[in-house]
């Protein structure tokens, strides 16, 4: 019976990822992996852009130094889609394996995972997978169990790859550990988040965001229900293009409300099993996640968010508010499973009830299976990309790379014309400047990198790009957008192929604009690494090992003395 839960979790992961397990890359929206990602200033939060993907890019640069990037990608996705349901099943306070399986499937086969995976938000999927393990370790810390704190540290570590994941993990860890442990858990949570927190605070351009994104990235309705019912069902992501078609099923709002009702009944049994305080905090945090997710859709909520992101540093993290529904996923999954367990006591055919409850997520969202029924595919980069990388790596000249056409996203025929983030910043061995304006429903949402706006003005005036730290211009072919010939006039063509053309900017190349100060940022990185390393050593080394060795030597010395 011990193997049932791991087996179910493995089946769930393979049902989604089997078509993607061959060699090659899955490139879709924000999910961009490269064969060998270089460690660049942006990966540490030292560039001109805000650290949105810090320390994820730095971690991937180290990982791809050990294994090919496509192998790293498959390991990350498999581990996340396996660990999430496994952790949720283990967290349920019950002796019934069947009820644990219900919770595992509800947690692993959710709209949150599907939509974030299709959006390419793999760090969010990783953070989501960590939450059950964080909750379990936090509850163990609250109970004062041995080695609970290092387990909590290691459970949080993969989640802090991005600011959002780090905050979601840190808050859950603190809530589950309880008030009496705040003196320990809060400093640990802050230290783990230092790799992105310090670059954000010390960023010379500040950390304010455009108010345009408050409404554009708000949770959205997926059927005839409301954004609230979508979020309660763990859906509602702002981008309609990544939503599984089954989320528009007419019965879904009714099923969602009934499921929430069952979950609320089941959550009543958490208090006698976990204790009133942790159970209440756990459920309240889930409710807060729902409230944040739908706040921008309420009357006046969008205006409040727009003011906050443009006046409060760091409030831009509240955009794309549906991501905070991750806090609701565990209460929903555990509560529903416990509700099914409670209902089973009054039914004679308990097996049928549990089977239906377990299969309901798969029945209502079958198009999550098999990589979204072909939505995701494995592709290879054209040879042009490796050729340009080689040219740039062999040149010692100064300067960053400007990628054209000016657009954050690309659509290449070699990737099935899928919308994908420009791979140049992760594929090439130099800092690459790309446009950070995002278009949502045809409306532009301004970016946060002041350097991009400056370079846009330089190109409009046909000024010298080298004076602004640009030493190379990369033109990507076969993707929407155009390049003004005047921008390329006077540049020297270095390499050209069917997909890419690389130009050298002549003359003296000025240094790039300064980012966050290097010393405190690196110190924060080392502090986070030290916390993780300490947690790992603490967990691996036997308790009292050195004290026992010391006592043994003392006894031997005394025996020799006599």
Regions found by a protein language model. Name each.
Residues 42-43, 191-270, 321, 457-460, ...:
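Periplasmic/ER-lumenal interhelical loops and adjacent helix-loop junctions
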Residues 10-85, 105, 110-128:
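Membrane-interface coil-to-helix junctions
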Residues 9-48, 185-232, 402-422:
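Aromatic-rich transmembrane-lumenal/periplasmic boundary elements in polytopic membrane proteins
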Residues 236-239, 250-291, 532-545:
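Hydrophobic, aromatic-rich transmembrane alpha-helices
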Residues 113-125, 245, 283, 287-338, ...:
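Membrane-helix boundary/interfacial segments in multi-pass membrane proteins
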Residues 187-190, 337-367, 525-532, 561-562:
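Signature aromatic-anchored transmembrane alpha helix within multi-pass, membrane-resident enzymes
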Residues 9, 82-91, 98-178, 182-200, ...:
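Membrane-embedded helix bundles of polyisoprenyl
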Residues 6-10, 210-212, 361-562:
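Extracytoplasmic
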């Amino acid at each position: 019976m011990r193997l049932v839960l791991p087996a179910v979790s493995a089946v769930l992961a393979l049902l989604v990822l089997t078509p993607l397990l061959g060699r090659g890359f899955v490139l879709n929206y924000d999910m961009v992996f490269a064969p060998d990602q270089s460690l660049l200033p942006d990966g540490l939060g030292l560039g001109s852009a805000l650290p949105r993907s810090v320390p994820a890019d730095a971690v991937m640069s180290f990982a791809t130094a050990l294994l090919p990037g496509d192998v790293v990608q498959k390991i990350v996705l498999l581990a996340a889609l396996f660990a999430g349901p496994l952790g949720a099943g283990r967290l349920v306070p019950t002796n019934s394996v069947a009820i644990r399986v219900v919770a595992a499937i509800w947690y692993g086969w959710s709209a949150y995972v599907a939509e974030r995976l299709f959006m390419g938000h793999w760090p969010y999927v990783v953070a989501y997978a960590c939450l059950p393990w964080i909750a379990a370790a936090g509850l163990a810390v609250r109970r004062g169990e041995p080695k609970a704190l290092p387990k909590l540290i290691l459970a949080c570590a993969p989640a802090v790859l991005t600011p959002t994941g780090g905050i979601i993990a840190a808050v859950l860890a603190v809530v589950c550990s309880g008030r009496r442990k705040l003196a320990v858990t809060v400093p640990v949570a802050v230290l783990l988040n230092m790799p992105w927190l310090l670059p954000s605070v010390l960023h010379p351009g500040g950390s304010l965001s455009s108010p345009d994104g408050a409404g554009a990235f708000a949770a959205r309705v997926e059927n005839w229900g409301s954004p609230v019912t979508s979020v309660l069902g763990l859906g509602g992501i702002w981008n309609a293009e990544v939503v599984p078609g089954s989320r528009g099923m007419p019965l879904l709002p009714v099923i969602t409300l009934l499921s929430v009702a069952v979950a609320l009944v089941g959550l009543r049994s958490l208090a006698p099993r976990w204790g009133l305080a942790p159970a209440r905090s756990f459920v309240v945090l889930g409710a807060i996640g729902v409230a944040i997710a739908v706040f921008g859709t309420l009357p006046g909520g969008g205006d409040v968010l727009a003011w906050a992101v443009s006046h409060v540093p760091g409030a831009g993290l509240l955009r794309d508010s549906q991501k905070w529904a991750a806090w609701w996923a565990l209460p929903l999954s555990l509560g529903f499973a416990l509700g099914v367990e409670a209902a089973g006591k009054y039914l004679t055919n308990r097996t049928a009830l549990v089977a239906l409850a377990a299969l309901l997520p798969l029945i209502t969202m079958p198009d999550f299976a098999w990589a979204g029924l072909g939505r995701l595919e494995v592709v290879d980069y054209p040879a042009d990309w490796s050729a340009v990388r080689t040219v740039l790596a062999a040149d010692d000249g100064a300067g960053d790379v400007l990628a054209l056409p000016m657009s954050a996203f690309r659509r290449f025929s070699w990737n099935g014309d899928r919308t994908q983030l420009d791979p140049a910043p992760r594929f090439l061995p130099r800092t690459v400047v790309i446009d950070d304006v995002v278009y949502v429903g045809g409306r532009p949402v301004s970016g946060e990198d002041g350097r991009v706006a400056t370079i846009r003005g330089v190109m409009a005036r046909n000024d010298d790009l080298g004076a602004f730290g640009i030493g190379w211009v990369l033109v990507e072919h076969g993707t929407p957008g155009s390049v003004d010939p005047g921008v390329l006039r006077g540049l020297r063509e270095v390499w050209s192929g069917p997909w890419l053309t690389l130009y050298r900017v002549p003359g003296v190349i000025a240094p790039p604009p300064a980012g966050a100060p290097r010393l405190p940022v690196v110190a924060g990185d080392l502090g986070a690494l030290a916390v993780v390393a300490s947690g790992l050593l603490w967990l691996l080394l036997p308790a009292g090992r050195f004290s026992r060795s010391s006592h043994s030597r003392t006894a031997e010395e005394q025996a020799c003395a006599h």
